[in-house]
From Swiss-Prot:
SMART domains in UniProt: TPR (SM00028)
Protein's recorded name: Tetratricopeptide repeat protein 36
PANTHER family (UniProt xref): CDNA SEQUENCE BC021608 (PTHR21405), TETRATRICOPEPTIDE REPEAT PROTEIN 36 (PTHR21405:SF0)
A GO BP annotation: tyrosine metabolic process
Gene name, Swiss-Prot/TrEMBL: ttc-36
Homology family: Belongs to the TTC36 family.
Keyword line: Repeat, TPR repeat
Hydrolase in keyword set: no
A UniProt-annotated Pfam family: TPR_11
SUPFAM superfamilies found in the cross-reference section: TPR-like
UniProt TPR repeat ranges: 43-76, 78-110, 115-148
Length: 179
């Protein structure tokens, strides 16, 4: 007889692309960034304006807003993360990497910003063909609960995906009584 935890672990093995929260294994609850800095609230407002501009594909203006947000509060990791996204969209990966490294140095280890920055940085590494660095960052993001990072880790390991598929087929046949 198996326990619910045993079934959850087995489900993770058989369904590697399923987010852990759907499998019965406890989900990691990430912290939000919060700073004790007099300019933090204004920085957040400028950052929201920058995000709106970026969504409207006004990337130069968005970068200006993110830069202003960082001038007001230079320790705001999410502003670095968002500016990095705008740089990525402008095909400026070096600037994006600089901002992502700064975001990761400022963000707490279990924050949403850290998770997002790891995914962004890993994506840049993957595009460059540096799968080892990509794998490391995707693993960090996956540990923080990113289902996208988890999918990328499986994609970077075709043998794991093949083994999981074979195991799923064997267990399905065992369930239905097929040989």
């Amino acid at each position: 007889m198996s326990t619910s935890h045993d079934r959850a672990v087995l489900n993770q093995i058989l369904n590697p692309l399923m987010p852990t929260s759907d499998s019965g294994i406890a989900e990691i609850h990430l912290e939000s960034d919060s700073l004790e800095h007099p300019g933090y609230e204004l920085s957040l407002q400028l950052e929201r304006e920058g995000v709106a501009l970026a969504e409207g594909v006004r990337l130069d203006e968005a970068i200006e807003k993110f830069t202003k947000a960082l001038e007001v509060c230079p320790k705001n990791p999410s502003a670095y993360n968002n500016r990095a996204q705008a740089y990525r969209l402008q095909n400026k990966p070096e600037k994006a990497l600089d901002d992502l490294n700064e975001a990761l140095s400022l963000a707490g280890p279990k924050t949403k910003t850290a998770c997002q920055a790891y995914v962004q940085r890993a994506s840049i590494y993957r595009l460059r063909g540096d799968d080892d660095k990509a794998r490391t960052d995707f693993a960090s993001a996956a540990e923080l609960g990113s289902s996208f990072a988890k999918m990328q880790l499986v994609a970077l390991n075709p043998y794991a995906a093949m083994c999981n598929k074979m195991l799923a087929e064997v267990f399905e046949k065992a369930k239905t009584g097929e040989d």
